[in-house]
């Protein structure tokens, strides 16, 4: 019952177009490598309760493993982007294989889901990655805040690393692969809300900042006009 009420609140909020208020700070939480079973479920429950939408960069092999979670992410109003199929490094990968990784992932997307962003594993952008992304009409998504949650595995340390750095327009890199990361992410949401931040998807952040998203371009953050 509680989850249904929380989901209803989230969907009602997402049904209203996001409009920027003067002086309102924004940030986008992004989650790599999932979905991951119980940790993604826990994260989605917490986000729904708080009425927050995020951007998930999903691995194809995990979408194949967790189709119901992939569907839930999309149905609950979160943005989905590509993170490759295998999560193998693309540093020396051929353009043909990079394209195949994206095609194999695309086949597993929920009906109607059309990703705008591609974040290669490790954020490594080679000429091949750039060319394939541009050809497939995808922008490349980087980040501006990285607490290295996958390495720290400490809820408080991850939370503090983000809160010490975050600024208006930042894209925050996290992973929904462990309890410490998920719990830190929800703590971060609560503190940023208390600081007046609104948390949105990356696509929403780009629109709020009136920044066109161009295929093949790399996006690290979307700062307010006065920071440009």
PLM feature spans:
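Alpha-helical scaffold elements lining the catalytic groove of polysaccharide deacetylases
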Residues: 39-42, 88-113, 122-168, 181-184
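Bacterial N-terminal signal peptides
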Residues: 6-15
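Active-site beta->alpha N-cap acidic-glycine motif
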Residues: 18-97, 101-108, 114-115, 207
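A cross-domain feature marking catalytic cores of carbohydrate-active enzymes
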Residues: 31, 58-61, 82-84, 120-122, ...
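Divalent metal-coordination and catalytic microenvironments
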Residues: 32, 47, 80, 118-121, ...
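Residue-level detector of anion-binding/catalytic polar loops
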Residues: 53, 79, 139, 146, ...
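C-terminal domain-boundary segment and adjacent tail
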Residues: 21, 49-50, 63-64, 180-228
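Positively charged n-region of N-terminal signal peptides that target proteins for export
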Residues: 1-3
